Amino acid sequence: MLKFTEEHEWLQIEGSVATVGITNYAVDQLGDLVFVELPEVGATFSKNGNAATVESVKAASDVYCPLDGEITEVNPAIVADPSLVNSDPQGAGWFFKLKLANPADADGLLDEAAYKELTA
């Protein structure tokens, strides 16, 4: 199940685990990324907690945790090569995997149609 936030994160949810990244729209707004800082595996976050940071040639921006949960995995490839986020933000450029505290909370996030409307 693919969901989105108003802060331009995407979540691919499988069971109780969500893979999280930033959307094409966010990447377009930021420009070329030059730095990515990811959370520690095992860290817990509340919804909208500051989970990661990205820096581009234009600006620095926070990446928020879309739901309550625990980080189970991070993507070291984007730390080594932030351009992966630019080239494939909703694929190889994922940020972290989050074990959701309450998977039903995802129902309150945006679906693809609602997100497209938000960014139109």
From Swiss-Prot:
Question: What GO cellular component entries does it have?
Answer: cytoplasm; glycine cleavage complex
UniProt cross-references to InterPro entries, sorted A to Z:
2-oxoA_DH_lipoyl-BS, Biotin_lipoyl, GCV_H, GCV_H/Fam206, GCV_H_sub, Single_hybrid_motif
Tell me which cofactor or cofactors this protein depends on: (R)-lipoate
> Transmembrane: is it a keyword of this entry?
no
Residues bearing N6-lipoyllysine? K58
Entry's CDD domains?
Answer: GCS_H (cd06848)
Q: Which domain of life is it from?
A: Bacteria
Q: How many cofactors are bound and how? A: Binds 1 lipoyl cofactor covalently.
Q: Does the keyword Signal feature in the UniProt annotation?
A: no
Q: What are the alphabetically sorted keywords of the record?
A: Lipoyl
**GO terms of biological process kind:** glycine decarboxylation via glycine cleavage system
Q: Which residues form the Lipoyl-binding domain?
A: 17-99
> What function does this protein fulfil?
The glycine cleavage system catalyzes the degradation of glycine. The H protein shuttles the methylamine group of glycine from the P protein to the T protein.
Q: Which NCBIfam families match?
A: gcvH (TIGR00527), PRK01202.1 (NF002270)
**Record note on quaternary structure:** The glycine cleavage system is composed of four proteins: P, T, L and H.
Q: Which family would the database say this protein is a member of? A: Belongs to the GcvH family.
- Name assigned to this protein: Glycine cleavage system H protein
